[in-house]
Design a protein with these regions (language model features):
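Catalytic machinery of carbohydrate-active enzymes
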Residues: 1-372
Length: 372
C-alpha cells in the first residue's frame, strides 16, 4: 500500500493528527486516519482534539492515543488569559516526540496556529492547507481547494498532496461491542426488544440556528409511528433534558426516553440499530452516514450542504433556501426561515426512505395476513 511519499513522510512513525472542532468533525477524520495507517504500517497515531470532539475517538479504530485540549485559537472568548496553558500544550506535544503532524481544518480555518505550536514542540513535518501565507510555520502546505468541497474530501486532498494513496474515501466507524450491549440493555429496560425495529429521533443540536423546532419533529415522528407501528427512541445529551417539554406528551406511549442516558458510543449503537433516523445537521448525521442507516436530515442554512451532507447513507436532506444562507451563526435572528418545513414533508421523506428499503411493504404484508 505504501507508495512514494514526499520528503521524509515515508519514515514517519509517530503521527499527530490535529482536529480541534466538534464530534462530527472528528468523525469525518476517519478516512484520513485509515489512509495514514494503510500507507504507514506500524505507525502510532495520536489525535489532538477538543474535549467534546475527543468523545468520537472510541469509534475510530485507527487512533492509538487521544489528547484532549481546549486551545486558544478555537476559543469563543471563554478561556481566560493564561499563556502558561498554551506553553503547557507545546511541552505536552514535545514529550510526544512526534515525527509529523497532519493539521485538519475546515475551509474557513487556518492551520497556522496549530502549526506554530507543533513547530515549537519540535515536530519536523507539519502538513496543512490554507488560503493565506503562513511563512515557514508549515513544512508542507497543500494547495487551497474550492470552498464547497466536502469536508471528507478536503481532508483527503491534504494527504494526497504528499503522495498518500487513498483506497477508500467512504466514512466509517466501528461501534464497540460494549456499547452495543449497553444500548441493548437500555432498550430492553424500556420494553423495546433488542433487534426489533424502531425509529430514532435526535431532535437537538448544540446551536439554536441548527435546531429544527422540537414540536414539529415530535409531530413528524408521531405520524411515522402511526404508519409503521414502531416506537421512537429519542436521544440527546444531558443538557437537552430541559428541552424535552411537550415532546414525550406528543409521542405518547410510543416515545422511548433515552435523553441524557448515553455516551457517544452508545448513541452510535442505537443509530446502527435504527430503521430510520430523524436529525438535524449535527453529529448524528455523520454517524448515520458512517453506518449506512437511512436518515431524514433537517439541514439549516448555517452551512453549505455540499461541505457536510451524507455521502454514503440513503437520506433526504430538507432545507429552505434563504437570502441569508450560509450564515455560520449560532443564533438565528430571523425566526429560522431555513427551517420553514412542515412536519408532513418530514413524514413524506421518511416514508419514501422506508419504502425504498421495503419496510412499508413488509408491514403491509403482515397487516394483510392478520386480516385474513
Amino acid at each position: 500500500m505504501k507508495g512514494a511519499l514526499a520528503g521524509s513522510w515515508g519514515e514517519a512513525r509517530r503521527l499527530l493528527v490535529v482536529r480541534l472542532d466538534n464530534i462530527g468533525d472528528v468523525v469525518m477524520t476517519g478516512p484520513v486516519l485509515r489512509a495514514l495507517k494503510e500507507n504507514l504500517p506500524g505507525s502510532h497515531i495520536t489525535l489532538l482534539a477538543s474535549p467534546g470532539g475527543s468523545k468520537a475517538a472510541p469509534l475510530l479504530p485507527w487512533v492509538d492515543e487521544v489528547l484532549a485540549w481546549r486551545v486558544l485559537w478555537q476559543d469563543l472568548g471563554r478561556l481566560s488569559f493564561d499563556p502558561a496553558r498554551e506553553l503547557e500544550l507545546v511541552e505536552t506535544l514535545r514529550r510526544g516526540s512526534y515525527d509529523a503532524a497532519v493539521i485538519l481544518t475546515s475551509f474557513k480555518q487556518t492551520p497556522h496556529a496549530a502549526g506554530y505550536a507543533c513547530y515549537l514542540a519540535g515536530i519536523p513535518l507539519r502538513l496543512g492547507g490554507s488560503k493565506e501565507w503562513g511563512g515557514g510555520v508549515l513544512s508542507d502546505e497543500a494547495p487551497s481547494v474550492p470552498d464547497e468541497l466536502h469536508q471528507v474530501q478536503r481532508n483527503l486532498r491534504l494527504i494526497e498532496h504528499l503522495g498518500f494513496r487513498v483506497e477508500d474515501r467512504a466514512l466509517s466507524i466501528r461501534v464497540p461491542e460494549e456499547a452495543r450491549g449497553t444500548a441493548a440493555q437500555l432498550l430492553e429496560a424500556r420494553s423495546v426488544t433488542p433487534g426489533s425495529p424502531y425509529l430514532l429521533l435526535n431532535p437537538w443540536a448544540s446551536a439554536q440556528a441548527r435546531t429544527y423546532p422540537t414540536d414539529r419533529f415530535a409531530r413528524a415522528a408521531g405520524r411515522l409511528c402511526e404508519e409503521t407501528g414502531w416506537p421512537v427512541v429519542v436521544t440527546g445529551t444531558g443538557k437537552d433534558r430541559e428541552r424535552t417539554s411537550g415532546l414525550f406528551e406528543a409521542l405518547g406511549d410510543r416515545g422511548v426516553d433515552l435523553v441524557g442516558a448515553t455516551g457517544l458510543p452508545e448513541l452510535a449503537a442505537l443509530v446502527e440499530g435504527a430503521r430510520l433516523v430523524l436529525t438535524n445537521n449535527t453529529s448524528t448525521m455523520h454517524l448515520l452516514d458512517a453506518l449506512r442507516v437511512p436518515g431524514v436530515v433537517l439541514f439549516s442554512g448555517t452551512e453549505l450542504e455540499e461541505q457536510w451532507r451524507p455521502r454514503s447513507a440513503r437520506h433526504r436532506l430538507l432545507r429552505r433556501e434563504t437570502w441569508c444562507s450560509p450564515c455560520y451563526a449560532f443564533e438565528c435572528p430571523y425566526n429560522l426561515e431555513c427551517f420553514d418545513i412542515p412536519p408532513e414533508e418530514v413524514v413524506e421523506a421518511g416514508l419514501s426512505l422506508l419504502a425504498e428499503a421495503g419496510d412499508r411493504a413488509a408491514k403491509n404484508s403482515r397487516q394483510e395476513e392478520s386480516r385474513a
